[in-house]
């Protein structure tokens, strides 16, 4: 069976020391593709670097709603200019996040 992990955060500090081993372990259990999801535009270069380094790894570009206040004003054009890169396969994180009940609906 082939598995696609459509939502991982390979750029998080938790994985930095063992990233290659983590990706190898995932491949050994059938994960053939991974999409590492952007939470901040400021971290996007790191995501793109990871996606470019590893076959089968792609990335998204976006700003998680909980990070939006810390990231400053983000224009759609700031995001769209990267979408033509072959390793960028989506836009996200985006939207409203009520999972942790910390997002202001207004």
Describe each PLM feature range.
Residues 1-106:
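Mid-domain alpha/beta scaffold segments of enzyme catalytic cores
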